[in-house]
Structure formats: C-alpha cells, structure tokens
Regions:
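Rossmann-fold NAD(P) dinucleotide-binding segment
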Residues: 51-112
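Rossmann-fold dinucleotide-binding core
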Residues: 93-173
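Active-site-proximal catalytic alpha-helix in oxidoreductases
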Residues: 128-135, 156, 160-192, 203-215, ...
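Interdomain hinge/lid region at the active-site interface
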Residues: 161, 209-274
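NAD(P)-dependent dehydrogenase/reductase Rossmann-like domain
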Residues: 267-291
Length: 291
C-alpha cells in the first residue's frame, strides 16, 4: 500500500504524520514546497515535485485543502498520471456538489473518490481520533479502511458521493450553535463575577457541556485564541451550509447569526484566530447592566 498526502496545513500535517507512524506514507506534496520538504526531512518520506508525480507513485491519495477550487485544481493535476483504481480520499470541507464533480473527473480517468471530511479539531488530527464521515461506493469505502483507520477513531459511510460533505455541513451547523452558546454562557458567567476557570471545570462535567465548551471555553477564560478552527474557514463552511439550505427554501438562524458575527471578526483582523474569539463579541452584551 502506497499512500500520498496533499495539503500540509494545520489539520493535514498531523494527519500525514499519523500515516507515517502507521508505516503507510510514501510521500507528500504541498503548494508551499518548503513545507513539504521540511515534513520529508522530519519523517524520511518523499517530497514530490508535483501532484502528478505523487499520483504516479501512489495507490491512495489523501487530500486536505482549504477550498472547493483548490480541490478541483488538485484533482485535475493528478489526472495525467493517476494510477488505475487509485482512490483519492478527500478530507477537505467543500460543497457536496464539488465532491460529486471531483468524483466524476476521477472516474473518467479510472480512479475513485471518497469524500471524507473530518471532525475533531487539531487535537483529533494529532491523536488520530477524528470522526470521518464518508461518501462514495461501498467497495471503495471498504478498500480504504486501512488508510482511514490510521487517521481517525471512527469512520462511517453516509451514502454515495457527496454524502460525506452533506454530513460535514450538518456538523458545521452544530459547531456554530455550540460556539455561540459557549461564548454567551461564558460572557454571562464573567458578568456575574464567577471564576471562569472554575466555571469550565464544573460545567464541563454537566449536562450542558459540549466539545466546544470543554475545549474552547478555556481559550475564552484566558482571552487567547490560538488557531485551531480559524474564523475564516468556518465562515467559508457556513456559506456552503447557507447555500445548501437555500435549495430547500430554508434560512437557518444560527448560520445567519454566526456569519454576521464572523463578518465583524474578519473586518477587525481576527480571521486567523480560533472561532472561540467570538467571545469578544459577547462580553459587550453585558456592558449596559448595573453594578
């Protein structure tokens, strides 16, 4: 089994590292070549000069890129030297229609796509505990199991091509609600004069806890928002959710509220911070109260 990896960002780098630890990684490619060379120096794998070179050497290719156009550009770059029956496992978050488009392009060249977006944050990527939601043919999903097992704790086939991305869109709506609630609750606790570290410690064990409260409320307590899930990326994802909902004639209030908040954060230079920086917008809600 020869596996290549494309996209060594905050999520991709630790995911590729886990494939290396599992003894499956042949090599990597990254748009910023220096990042690929540094990873190759660290792990001893190969840094390919182009996606086509990687495609010629690998039976499985994992991709993790930032945007729909990036994914389609990578897929097109793979096609000239794609091995027959190669499986591309795309862990990016893109529109379901984009996943289906990529699947059609690969199928025409004799390959297959699994759309396999992930959830679990940078922590999950580092610890290989990601939840992986998959769309594609059953036989392709079964063949990809050794690769998926090296990347995450759980993987489930949700349906045909695009179903993984539709599931991820659902997840991103959940994330919007969770971070909104966590930020408003923490702002309320702060206004009440409660010790925020203690709030996290006790309520993180309660019925109202969520992954975002447990793992991101501490960022709010410290007022530090190191990049985990960047505002600009969740903003991109929620725009996908908005478009998908619009096809059903629906407007989702939590999506619209969060996009409005993100517009303010992006305009004030916080787009590269973790989405927990939304706490900045919640504390002023309590500024008009009495002492």
């Amino acid at each position: 089994m020869k596996v290549g990896f494309i996209g060594l960002g905050a999520m991709g780098r630790p995911m590729a590292r886990n494939l290396h630890r599992a003894g499956k990684l042949t090599g990597v490619w990254n748009r910023t070549a220096a990042r690929a060379r540094a990873f190759a120096d660290e792990t001893g794998c190969r840094a390919f000069e182009s996606p086509a070179d990687l495609a010629a050497a690998c039976d499985f290719i994992v991709t993790c890129v930032s945007a729909d156009a990036d994914l389609l550009a990578v897929v097109d770059a793979l096609l000239p030297r794609l091995r027959q029956s190669c499986i591309v496992i795309d862990c990016s978050t893109v529109a379901a229609d984009t996943a289906r488009d990529a699947a059609r392009r690969l199928a025409a060249a004799g390959g297959s796509l699994l759309d396999c977006p992930v959830s679990g944050g940078v922590e999950g990527a580092k610890n290989a505990t990601l939840a992986i939601m998959c769309g594609g043919d059953v036989d392709v999903f079964e063949r990809a199991q050794p690769v998926l097992a090296a990347l995450g704790r759980t993987n489930v086939r949700m349906g045909p091509s695009g179903a993984g991305q539709a599931t991820k869109a659902t997840n991103q709506i959940l994330c919007a609600g969770a971070i909104q609630v966590a930020a408003e609750a923490m702002a309320f606790a702060q206004a009440e004069g409660l010790p925020l570290d203690s709030v996290v410690a006790i309520l993180g064990q309660g019925a109202g806890a969520s992954w975002y409260f447990v793992h991101r409320a501490p960022f709010m307590a410290r007022g530090k928002y190191p990049a985990g899930f960047r505002v600009r990326l969740h903003d991109k994802d929620l725009r996908i959710c908005r478009d998908m909902a619009a096809r059903h004639g629906a407007v989702l209030p939590v999506v619209e509220t969060t996009l409005a908040d993100y517009a303010r954060l992006l305009a004030t230079g916080h787009g590269e911070e973790d989405i927990s920086t939304i706490f900045r917008l919640k504390t002023p809600l309590f500024a008009g109260g009495g002492g």
